[in-house]
Amino acid sequence: ITLLNVSKLNLLRLALGGHVGRFCIWTESSFRKLDDLYGTWRKSAKLKADYNLPMHKMTNTDLTRILKSQEIQRALRAPNKKVKRRELKKNPLKNL
C-alpha cells in the first residue's frame, strides 16, 4: 500500500514503469483537492498560477456517426475493390 499526497502527485510513483493500471482508491476530498489544484473546464485553478485545464480535442465522441456522415463520405474516394495479385518472380538459377 502506497499513500500519496494529492498536492505532491508524482506520475512515476503513481504509475510505476509507465503502467497506469494500478489500483487506486480516490476519496471525495482528494477529488476536491485536485479541482482546487488543477481547476475544471468551467473554473480556473486556485492553487496553480495561470493554469487552465486543457479542453478535449474532440467534443463529439460519436465517431461512427461522424465518419458515416454525408460530408465525410463525399470527401473520401471510392474503395479500390480490385485485388491485384503479386507475380511470382522466378529465379533463373533454380528454375531451369
Curated annotation (Swiss-Prot):
Record's keyword terms, sorted: Cytoplasm, Ribonucleoprotein, Ribosomal protein
The subcellular localization recorded is: Cytoplasm
Q: Which Pfam families match?
A: Ribos_L4_asso_C
Q: Which GO terms describe its cellular component?
A: cytoplasm; ribonucleoprotein complex; ribosome
| Bias kind Basic residues: ranges | 79-96
Q: Name one GO molecular function term.
A: structural constituent of ribosome
Q: Does the keyword Cytoplasm apply?
A: yes
Question: What Gene Ontology terms for biological process does this UniProt record contain?
Answer: translation
User: Could you tell me what this protein does?
Assistant: Component of the large ribosomal subunit. The ribosome is a large ribonucleoprotein complex responsible for the synthesis of proteins in the cell.
Q: Subunit structure, per the record?
A: Component of the large ribosomal subunit.
By sequence similarity, the record places it as follows: Belongs to the universal ribosomal protein uL4 family.
Query: What is this protein's name?
Result: Large ribosomal subunit protein uL4
